Amino acid sequence: MDILQIVILALIQGLTEFLPVSSSAHLILPSQLLGWSDQGLAFDVAVHAGTLIAVLVYYRGTLRTLLSGAFGRREAAHLSLDGGQGIDRSDADSQLHTATASKDVITARDAWREIMCLVVATIPVMLLGLLFATAIDTYFRGLNTIAYATLGFGLLLGVAYRFRGADGDEQPITRLDHALTIGLAQALALIPGTSRSGVTITAASFLGYNIATSARFSFLLSIPVISGALLLMLATQSDAMAGDAILEILAAMSIAGLSAYLTIAFFVGLVKRIGMMPFVVYRVLLAALLFAII
């Protein structure tokens, strides 16, 4: 791969991994319009590793709060919906009182509930991915499928936001039945063009959560999903990585990671200002472009 190809594809992966617009729908465009060949396993591993590092770094405070709340801490812990670093409960009793009175408080019980929700929501996509990965690669990788999924799930996102997600609940997702529903929806993202973040935000919105809560859960949910995808790629196709240039891999990882981090950082604030409908319109236009290419 030349440097231009690395930069463009890594940027596409990083920018679209956490936006509700389908990374696969965008990654197929260069190959169709510019005749680029498949980027190879090493590149896929690099960009996925970059996006995983991005979400881990951005939500490091939230993850630390969840884990400290779940293991051995009796007092309430502050959990910011936007991925902030939280408040050290040992600083002052007044801080604890203030945080406890806020809506962004998580107890040890709630920390365990949210961790369990993330686990439950991960199970469907892991199981179905292991069982049907080959079939999906064989029958659902075509441009037709990507175009229809981009359009259909984009319109569904618009319906969810219009009728449920704009003014929904802002509390963290701690109901296991809701987590399972979101997890089942996430499994649909195995179909290229669906958008993992898009379909999970859609499901959470239909369940009555607002965009900030839906996006936060979706982004946290990406951690086990991307980790699992990386492990699967390495376990089944590691021989394909032999001889790849380390500088190309590091460049792809860095570009994808930085662009993914910036996307996460700006997404919720952007949606609060412009809503989700611009993303819906964008998906419709993207689908139209894909249909025109077919």
PLM region descriptions:
Residues M1-I294:
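Multi-pass membrane proteins that catalyze or facilitate reactions on polyprenyl-/lipid-phosphate substrates
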